[in-house]
Amino acid sequence: MEFSVKSGNPEKQRSACIVVGVFEPRRLSGVAEQLDKVSDGYLSNLLRRGDLEGKSGQVLLLHHVPNILAERVLLVGCGKERELDERQYRQIIARTMNTLNETGSMEAVCFLSELHVKGRDTYWKVRQAVESARATLYNFNELKSKKEEPRRPLRKLVFNVPSRKELALGEQAVQHALAVATGMDICRNVANMPPNICTPRYLADQAKLMADNYDNLTVATVEEAEMEKLGMNAYLAVGRGSEHESVLTLMHYKGAADDQAPIVLVGKGLTFDSGGISIKPSANMDEMKYDMGGAAGVLGAMQALAELQLPINVIGTVAGCENMPDGKAYRPGDILTTMSGQTVEVLNTDAEGRLVLCDTLTYIERFEPESVIDLATLTGACVIALGSHASAVLSQHNPLAHEILNAAQQSGDKAWRMPLWDEYQSMLDSPFADMANIGGREAGTITAACFLSRYTKKYNWAHMDIAGTAWQGGKDKGSTGRPVPLLTQFLINRCNTEAAE
């Protein structure tokens, strides 16, 4: 599928189909009015007749419109003009994409990128349009014996920009969008794999396959034997009950000078989380294959980064592990000595992600990072607090937190900051160890971040809890590809800031 931008008049487009908007109630958009004028009122007559109201998501396909060079004109309902927001814009693009494939058109020119979305420029509208269009094409059927490919004749989609001056901006938007979309596909493919295939070793292998395509991306692994020497006892304890060995995968992307301190992305990679001895209820336990959503997000972000060849140093860290009950599994009541030397009393083996992450966060101190962001499907409490719309951001470093929130706002990959105040730290007190691995029923997302904060004193750090956003359940069960758009935007912004300085 090819995406591009151009600037031109709608009536002069020699295309299989051109796409224009209609607002509610029965009001042509500016571009549609141009077509109406050239076609001697053909479109406005249709609207007066009641063929299309203009409600969001309505479509009307027209053939042989008078004086128009295109074979077809697709009218797309956009709702009330003043109420057109970002979410509705993306939904309109997705509806358009599905309709175009139903029409049989092999190529089309879309003028919906000229719609007014409050506070958004041409770059944003083109980028979101391409990302939304690509998302409609995603289909995970690798493991089906009979692969029924959906009918998708559309091969080329061109988005029109208002003026030739904005072509460069539009082209950059397409480039960024395609990199993000490819990263999201990687994230979704890995996360959707079943846990009998997607093991900690599989995550490492996927990183190595990615590195084969880029000269400035290299991969190393930390195996269990080395973890033992390093004293990563918390990480090792979580994986002891599994047949599959734990693997910490390090992806080194070199886009800048060696002396530039790297940004480190850390992804929780629990390829299956049964809960261990504190076993989870059976209902929806199959979805615990998505407990490696943070690791999948890191893989996706590294793919987008490498595709864009951004001038920045980044280390993607994939903390692969599996939490299973077994005679060798760790138990409630165990006290673990972490790599940092701090001790942890295990009160619940289902609070395992923080144990894997705490040793990983200590390990990466050796890279002297400029900033660290960890991503984890860490707490059910986050889903209760924020639902499935926003990822949680927790940090004691305000500038980094603000950067992440800005990237969320720009990319449309929403996030919300939660407090990380010292008052919550005492909830982790243990009579037998330096801390417990859970803090009780209240403020679960915050106390989990408090736990991690004790291992991040040597660098600027932020934690993202993506438990509600990494995947969706139900009939449309599957990975969402988040937070790849947010992370990619964060890295783009970092490069832009450094270039400006």
Swiss-Prot record:
GO biological process: proteolysis
Names of required cofactors: Mn(2+)
Single GO MF annotation: metalloaminopeptidase activity
Organism of derivation: Idiomarina loihiensis (strain ATCC BAA-735 / DSM 15497 / L2-TR)
Chief localization: cytoplasm
Pfam family, one: Peptidase_M17
Binding-site residues for Mn(2+) 2, renumbered to this chain: K268, D273, D291, E352
Cofactor, how bound (note): Binds 2 manganese ions per subunit.
EC number(s) stated in the UniProt entry for this protein: 3.4.11.1, 3.4.11.10
Compartments in which it is found: Cytoplasm
Family: Belongs to the peptidase M17 family.
Enzyme type, top EC level: hydrolase
Residue numbers annotated as active site: K280, R354
Catalyses which reaction(s): Release of an N-terminal amino acid, Xaa-|-Yaa-, in which Xaa is preferably Leu, but may be other amino acids including Pro although not Arg or Lys, and Yaa may be Pro. Amino acid amides and methyl esters are also readily hydrolyzed, but rates on arylamides are exceedingly low; Release of an N-terminal amino acid, preferentially leucine, but not glutamic or aspartic acids
UniProt: Mn(2+) 1 binding residues: D273, D350, E352
GO terms for cellular component: cytoplasm
Full protein name: Probable cytosol aminopeptidase
Keywords: Aminopeptidase, Cytoplasm, Hydrolase, Manganese, Metal-binding, Protease
Purpose: Presumably involved in the processing and regular turnover of intracellular proteins. Catalyzes the removal of unsubstituted N-terminal amino acids from various peptides.
